[in-house]
């Protein structure tokens, strides 16, 4: 019996892949740091073993899949090589796996996870679909027709993939610790485009994506009239969004989605265009769009007393703009309060003014200390450099969250890609203790 062992199984992509293989009746286990991570819940529900890192975890006959964050000097990877066991890097293994299906890669600087989740949900309503989402969610179906997966541009990892289709949501400068500038990012996407085998669904409102060249048809979607798929007559409501879709200037149908903000309309348009291209029944698409409940850490909302708490992964100025816009659409009468934890010193330094501008669209801003990545845990920059650029911004720690109580009718948006959930949990606990 082959055992698939994941080195770093709690990583979001790794966790998703482990779930897929388990669902396909393979034996799966993995190792990681003992600190609890949100991806553990889905692994534990499936009974997948999570071990502490130990070279003795590695045994002959296993298939070793290693997360991209772990170097070749990691004790388990060294142990595998000593036993002459091949070590498959996550993105290479995924690239081989998807070749068994009609594969759809979802990529872009922003909106990847939400669009992947939405596409997987919609496709499942019509055909057996396996999927891998960057929020740590994965699902495998043995007789799948489609394989939908999130493909990340960071360090050009998506160049390991040769998908049938690619949805490209946008090109924007991010990951300044790796990419030199917007041209470097564009070149990565251009290279990816040349690896797609059947067709590309790209946002035509994005100036960078308009320049992409490909060997396959490129279908553009967006709000502009030049797009192949265009959203018109948009009704932004507190219970979602309704819009008409025109295909090459001819009315196609009217759709309702559960999401808020322009970015949610664009994500849905991408899914509608892909499904149209694959002849998925439009009634199935319409129904599935109305039943989508979202993905983890993307505008996840819960009421707490008179307040509303939103948990969101937004960690780039463009994403912060979108999240605040969505909150204002759904809760037009409420005060919008942003609680933001910058993620990585390099990103914070590069986009300092842009962060200040986007956060200033909230009514009140609270800033947590900068969360350094594993590759860079210190920098000369401090959170005060961002604070002084935002009028009225206050600093907050996980022991001073009680200050948020004064926003009695507020929408509290906890945003960040680090451990911002620690601050949210501290505040929830603070409120619960006060209520006793």
UniProtKB/Swiss-Prot annotation:
Q: Fetch the SUPFAM superfamilies from UniProt.
A: MurCD N-terminal domain, MurD-like peptide ligases, catalytic domain, MurD-like peptide ligases, peptide-binding domain
What is one GO cellular-component annotation here? cytoplasm
The UniProt entry, under Gene3D superfamilies, shows: Mur ligase, C-terminal domain, Mur-like, catalytic domain, NAD(P)-binding Rossmann-like Domain
Which gene name belongs to this protein? murC
Q: Which UniProt keywords apply?
A: ATP-binding, Cell cycle, Cell division, Cell shape, Cell wall biogenesis/degradation, Cytoplasm, Ligase, Nucleotide-binding, Peptidoglycan synthesis
Report the superkingdom from the record: Bacteria
Kindly list the biological process annotations in GO that this record carries.
cell division; cell wall organization; peptidoglycan biosynthetic process; regulation of cell shape
Principal place of residence: cytoplasm
The entry marks the following residues as binding ATP, namely: 108-114
The molecule here is called UDP-N-acetylmuramate--L-alanine ligase
């Amino acid at each position: 019996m082959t055992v698939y062992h994941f080195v770093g199984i709690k990583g979001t992509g790794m966790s998703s892949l482990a779930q897929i293989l388990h669902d396909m009746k393979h034996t799966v286990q993995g190792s990681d740091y003992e600190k609890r991570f949100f991806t553990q819940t889905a692994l534990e529900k499936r009974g997948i073993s999570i071990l502490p890192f130990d070279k003795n975890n590695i045994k002959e006959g296993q298939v070793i899949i290693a997360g991209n964050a772990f170097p070749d000097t990691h004790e388990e990877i060294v142990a595998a090589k000593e036993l002459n066991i091949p070590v498959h890097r996550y993105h290479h293994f995924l690239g081989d796996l998807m070749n068994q299906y009609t594969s759809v890669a979802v990529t872009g600087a922003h909106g990847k996870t939400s669009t992947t989740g939405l596409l997987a949900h919609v496709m499942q309503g019509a055909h057996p679909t396996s999927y891998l989402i960057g929020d740590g969610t994965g699902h495998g179906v043995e007789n799948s027709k489609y394989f939908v997966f999130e493909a990340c541009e960071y360090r050009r990892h998506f160049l390991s993939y040769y998908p049938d289709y690619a949805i490209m949501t946008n090109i924007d400068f991010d990951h300044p610790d790796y990419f030199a500038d917007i041209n470097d990012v564009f070149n990565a996407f251009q290279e990816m485009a040349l690896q797609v085998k059947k067709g590309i669904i790209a946002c035509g409102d994005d100036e960078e994506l308009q320049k992409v060249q490909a060997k396959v048809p490129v279908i553009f979607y967006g709000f502009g009239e030049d797009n192949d798929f265009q959203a018109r007559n948009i009704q932004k409501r507190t219970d979602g969004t309704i819009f008409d879709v025109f295909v090459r200037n001819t009315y196609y149908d009217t759709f309702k989605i559960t999401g808020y903000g322009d970015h949610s309309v664009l994500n849905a348009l991408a899914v509608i265009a892909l499904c149209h291209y694959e002849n998925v029944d439009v009634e199935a698409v319409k129904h599935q769009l109305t039943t989508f409940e979202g993905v983890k850490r993307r505008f996840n909302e819960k009421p707490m007393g008179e307040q509303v708490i939103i948990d969101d992964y937004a960690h780039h100025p463009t994403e912060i703009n979108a999240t605040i816009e969505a909150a204002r659409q759904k809760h037009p009468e409420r005060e919008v309060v942003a609680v933001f934890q910058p993620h990585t010193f390099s990103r914070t330094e590069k986009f300092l003014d842009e962060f200040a501008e986007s956060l200033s669209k909230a009514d009140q801003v609270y800033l947590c200390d900068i969360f350094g990545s594993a590759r860079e845990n210190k920098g000369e920059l401090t959170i005060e450099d961002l604070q002084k650029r935002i009028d009225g911004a206050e600093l907050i720690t996980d022991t001073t969250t009680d200050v948020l109580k004064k926003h009695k009718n507020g929408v509290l948006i906890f945003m960040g890609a680090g451990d911002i959930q620690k601050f949210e949990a501290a505040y929830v606990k603070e409120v619960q203790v006060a209520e006793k």
